[in-house]
C-alpha cells in the first residue's frame, strides 16, 4: 500500500523539474558562455550588468541544487524512517502475537473462551495500531513531499525573479548608457557653441580694441602735430623776439655811436676855432678825427 501511494506522488517530476532548472542555470553559468556574454556586453559597456546576471544565475543554481539535495535527503530519510517503523511495527506485532499465542496455549485449559476473545482483541488492536502508524507515516511522507514541492517552487520562482531582475537591470543599464551618451552629445554641442561664441566675442573685442588703438594713435598724432606746431610757433616767436631785441640793441648802439660822433665833431669844431694856427687847427682836427675814430671803434 505504501509503495503504491509513493508511486502516485510526483516526486520524480519535482526532481526532474529541479534538474531542468539547475541544468538551465548551470548552462547560463558556464565559463565559456559567461566569457562570450561578458565580451559582448563589454563592447556595449554593460560588463557590470553581466556580472550581476552571472551572480544572480549562480546564486539561483546554488539555491536550486541545495533545494534538490535537501528534498532528496528529506525523502530518503523519510523513506528510511517509514521502512524502519513498518519493520519495527511488523516485528513487534509478530512478537506480540507469538507471546499472545504462548499465553493462549498456557491458559487455554483454564479459560479457552476468554483467551480466544483476548487474542482476537489484541490482534484487532495490533491491526488498528499498524493501520494508524501506516497512516501517520503516509501523512509524514506526503507532508515532506509537499514541503519539497514548495521548496522547489520557491527556488524556481527565485530563479525566475532573479533572471527578470537581471534583465531589468540590463535594460536599465542600456537606458542609462543611452541617456549618458545623449547628455554627453548635448554637452559637447553646448561646449562647441560656447567656444564659437567666445571666439566671435574675442574677434569682436579685438576689432574694437584695434579700432580704439587706431583712434588713440590718430589722437596722439594730432596731439603731437599740435604740440609741434605750438613749438614751431614758440620758436618763431622767440626768433622774432630775438631779432627785434637785436635790432633794438643795434639801433640803440647806432644812436649811441651817432651821438658820440656828433659830440666828438662838435668838440673838434670848437677846438679848431680856438687854435692859433692852421697847423694847430689841423692838428686839432686830426686829433679830433682820431678821437672820433677811436670813439667809433669803441
Swiss-Prot record:
Keywords (A to Z) from UniProt: Repeat
Keyword Repeat: yes
Renumbered ranges of LEA-like repeats: 48-117, 128-197, 201-270
Annotated region described as Disordered, given as residue ranges: 174-298
Low complexity: compositionally biased ranges: 194-208, 275-298
Keyword field contains Repeat: yes
GO molecular function: protein folding chaperone
Residue ranges with Basic and acidic residues bias: 174-193, 209-233
PANTHER family, per database record: DAUER UP-REGULATED-RELATED, RE19971P
Similarity field: Belongs to the LEA type 1 family.
Protein name per its UniProtKB record: Protein DR_1172
Amino acid at each position: 500500500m505504501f509503495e503504491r501511494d509513493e508511486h502516485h506522488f510526483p516526486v520524480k517530476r519535482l526532481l526532474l523539474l529541479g534538474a531542468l532548472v539547475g541544468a538551465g542555470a548551470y548552462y547560463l553559468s558556464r565559463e565559456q558562455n559567461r566569457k562570450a556574454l561578458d565580451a559582448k556586453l563589454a563592447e556595449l559597456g554593460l560588463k557590470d550588468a553581466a556580472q550581476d546576471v552571472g551572480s544572480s544565475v549562480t546564486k539561483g543554481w546554488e539555491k536550486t541544487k541545495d533545494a534538490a539535495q535537501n528534498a532528496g535527503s528529506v525523502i530518503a530519510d523519510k523513506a528510511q524512517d517509514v521502512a524502519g517503523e513498518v519493520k519495527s511495527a511488523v516485528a513487534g506485532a509478530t512478537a506480540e502475537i507469538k507471546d499472545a499465542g504462548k499465553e493462549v496455549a498456557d491458559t487455554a485449559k483454564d479459560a479457552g473462551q476468554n483467551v480466544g476473545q483476548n487474542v482476537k482483541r489484541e490482534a484487532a488492536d495490533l491491526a488498528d495500531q499498524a493501520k494508524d502508524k501506516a497512516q501517520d507515516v503516509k501523512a509524514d511522507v506526503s507532508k515532506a513531499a509537499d514541503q519539497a514541492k514548495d521548496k522547489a517552487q520557491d527556488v524556481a520562482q527565485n530563479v525566475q525573479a532573479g533572471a527578470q531582475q537581471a534583465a531589468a537591470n540590463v535594460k536599465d543599464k542600456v537606458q542609462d548608457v543611452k541617456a549618458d551618451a545623449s547628455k554627453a552629445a548635448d554637452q559637447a554641442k553646448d561646449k562647441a557653441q560656447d567656444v564659437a561664441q567666445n571666439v566671435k566675442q574675442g574677434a569682436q573685442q579685438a576689432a574694437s580694441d584695434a579700432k580704439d588703438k587706431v583712434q588713440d594713435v590718430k589722437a596722439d598724432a594730432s596731439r603731437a602735430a599740435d604740440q609741434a606746431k605750438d613749438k614751431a610757433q614758440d620758436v618763431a616767436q622767440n626768433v622774432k623776439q630775438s631779432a627785434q631785441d637785436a635790432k633794438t640793441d643795434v639801433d640803440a648802439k647806432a644812436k649811441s655811436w651817432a651821438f658820440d660822433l656828433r659830440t666828438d665833431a662838435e668838440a673838434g669844431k670848437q677846438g679848431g676855432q680856438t687854435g692859433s694856427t692852421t697847423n694847430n687847427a689841423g692838428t686839432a682836427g686830426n686829433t679830433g678825427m682820431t678821437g672820433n675814430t677811436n670813439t667809433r671803434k669803441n
